């Protein structure tokens, strides 16, 4: 997602194959853990390049297509961006990640306001402790699991199906009046 030309080419190919895009879920993320005062600009940018710039490239292409469609009389669409529980909580040693995901929330709220007149909704999804390739090492770590799992009222790690179900809802007509929101999927971790 960090390669602007590749994102634009991929979007053009999608339009060639399907003729239109009704929903776009920009779902990508990378993290780098380390002391903030030892983080290099290159390391900082590497996280923002994917988490924020890649989201911008992807959603810009989709929003432009949806606006043009609406101006031609075919309004509607769904824009979704993946933020993170880390956008709401101070998480030491992953400041670039938290900052980038906080920016996703702000971007999605701004898009919700700007594109509503075109029948487009925009929301962010904030996964908490969801098992993915990026998080697998954390959940396998007994010390981490013993510290975090008891704070999740549902008492389990989230899995992809938890995340996917929210995405399906946000892309459906059932969410046509749901915009500018940040949906936290964390099993109750944040409120506990």
Task: Go through each PLM region and give its residues.
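Substrate-binding pocket helix/loop in short-chain dehydrogenase/reductase
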Residues: 35-36, 43-48, 148
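Alpha-helical segment proximal to the catalytic Tyr-Lys
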Residues: 64, 113-114, 176
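Active-site helix of classical SDR
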Residues: 59, 100, 108
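C-terminal substrate-recognition "lid" of short-chain dehydrogenase/reductases
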Residues: 156-185, 190
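Active-site loop immediately N-terminal to the catalytic Tyr-X3-Lys motif
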Residues: 36-37, 89-95, 117-118, 155, ...
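Short, small/polar-rich loop/turn modules that mediate ligand/substrate recognition or access, typified
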Residues: 25, 116-121, 178-180
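Residue(s) in the substrate-gating loop at a strand-loop-helix junction
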Residues: 84
């Amino acid at each position: 997602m960090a390669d602007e030309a590749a994102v634009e080419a991929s979007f053009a190919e999608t339009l060639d194959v399907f003729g239109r895009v009704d929903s776009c879920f920009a779902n990508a993320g990378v993290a780098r853990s380390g002391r903030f005062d030892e983080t290099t600009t290159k390391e900082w940018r590497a996280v923002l390049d994917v988490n924020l710039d890649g989201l911008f490239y992807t959603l810009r292409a989709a929003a432009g297509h949806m606006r043009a469609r609406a101006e031609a009389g075919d309004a509607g669409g769904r824009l979704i961006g993946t933020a993170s529980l880390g956008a709401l909580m101070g998480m030491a040693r992953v400041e670039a990640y938290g900052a980038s995901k906080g920016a996703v929330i702000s971007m999605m709220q701004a898009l919700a306001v700007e594109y509503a007149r075109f029948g487009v909704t925009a929301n962010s999804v904030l996964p908490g402790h969801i098992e993915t390739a990026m998080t697998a090492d954390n959940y396998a770590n007994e010390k981490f699991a013993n510290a975090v799992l008891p704070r999740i009222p549902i008492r389990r790690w989230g899995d992809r199906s938890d995340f996917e179900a929210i995405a399906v809802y946000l892309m459906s007509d059932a969410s046509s009046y749901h915009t500018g929101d940040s949906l936290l999927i964390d099993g109750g971790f944040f409120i506990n």
